[in-house]
Design a protein with these regions (language model features):
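Vicinal oxygen chelate
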Residues: 58, 70, 76-82, 101-104, 109-117, 159-177, 199-202, ...
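Short, conserved charged micro-motifs
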Residues: 35-40, 77-82, 121-122, 174-179
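Charge-rich, low-complexity N-terminal segments
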Residues: 2-16, 22-26, 31-32, 36-73, ...
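Core segments of cupin and vicinal oxygen chelate
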Residues: 116-149, 178-179
């Protein structure tokens, strides 16, 4: 049986300096500079993944390749294992051999959060309208893995003074301050400070988003 490891344990593994832990994966971005170089890197990753029988999600763009690793059989009670750390190190080594640099500050994960009094009644609607599947007790997920996850947050009472839907934006821990500063410079305000785990920001009309770097340093406690 595969055992889960914490984000801290993942970061303690050798060779994973290029990677950051987001909400449900360890991820990085490789700056390939061209589509052909990206294909070359993806082919190397595919060979490593087949050899390990452990396959990442890969997003191939013209000048970059984004790679996300997770051990799916652990979810929803965990998402990283030693297999992810081992493959991450191998992928980074392959990129270095090709002269391709990593830029992990480019990665992020966006999640839609919906406040609900009765999650069991509300969640099926959103799964149906989005073409998603129910996952665990609080989520709806895109079966193809393309769209953002939807997480349902339990409310005890209606809160008419604030929106019922907000975005959770998971960023690398070393990018959180810059992201918050940029949002404030663009007219936003910090309305809740739970740093270093998360901050809630609002736009000039009160629409909210959470900047959440906590998965990148979570110790599992």
């Amino acid at each position: 049986m595969v055992e889960a490891i914490t984000p801290q344990q993942f970061h303690a593994a050798a060779g994973v300096e290029d990677w950051r832990v987001l909400s449900t994966s360890a991820a990085t971005c490789f700056q390939t500079g061209s589509f052909a170089r990206g294909v070359e890197l993806v082919e190397r990753i595919a060979a490593l993944a087949d050899a390990a029988n452990h396959h990442p999600d890969i997003d191939l763009r013209y000048a970059a390749v984004i790679v996300r690793l997770a051990t799916h059989e652990l979810k929803p009670h965990g998402f990283l294992s030693e297999r992810d750390a081992a493959l991450a190190a191998q992928i980074s080594a392959a990129a270095r051999e090709l002269g391709i640099a990593a830029d992990p500050g480019k990665v992020q994960t966006v999640q839609i959060a919906i406040d609900a009094l009765d999650i069991a009644r509300v969640r099926p609607f959103w799964a149906a309208v989005l073409g998603y599947e129910l996952f665990g007790d609080e989520d709806a997920v895109d079966p193809g893995g393309f769209g953002p996850n939807v997480w349902f947050q339990q409310m005890d009472a209606p809160r008419p003074q604030r929106n019922r839907i907000h975005l959770d934006i998971y960023v690398p821990a070393d990018q959180a301050a810059a992201r918050i500063d940029a949002a404030v410079a663009a007219g936003g305000t910090v309305v809740r400070d739970q740093g270093p785990h998360w901050w809630t920001l609002a736009d000039p009309e009160g629409n909210e988003a959470d900047i959440a770097p906590w998965p990148d340093f979570d110790d599992g406690s």
